[in-house]
Amino acid sequence: ADGQCMMIVEQGKIVEVCAEPGEFTYDSSTEPSIFTGKLGEGLKKTFATFGKRFTYGGDTGKDQRVYYFNTKELIDNKFGTANPFLFHVADHNTGLSREVQVRCNGIYSYRITDPILFYKNVCGNVEMTYDREEIDGQLKTEFISALQPAFAQLSKLELLPSDIPAHAGDLEEAMNEALTKKWAEKRGISVVSVAMNPITLKEEDL
């Protein structure tokens, strides 16, 4: 179905991946196949690294499992900075250059963009279900930690703190860049959107 990826695993090894809607017939006698759907060519590269077909003289392996991954956008992830962090305000036209302390909060969404990486590095051989609640706390902590380096990228655009909520696209790009190693390259997860409330400054920075 749309927004879903199926994965067949034998003896802990990925042997088939299908992210396209429609009927799928598994044939253990053929070479491994991968149908990426909307997940793109990057999934094929990951499969080439981790996927492997096991053969047992034509017999099914001792442990065969089918997993279904939700690849839809996962929304309503609230975040907020408990402590302020530094943001550099600059304007080369006026010569302005100062550090201010900011706090922010809002909502972000993410989605699984590489189910193979998510399986290998997050959920493994889970027996029943793996719910988002099991990882959302960790993702939230990492998301908040990535805000400061992402804001540092936005400061290069010479934005005022009050301008940032209106630059959601730039912020989403900066967050994905800051989270590349922990999210995209390790877990196969990407930020989809960030909606931010007005940013607050410490009183002495107003």
State where each predicted segment sits.
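N-terminal hydrophobic membrane-entry segments
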Residues: A1-D205
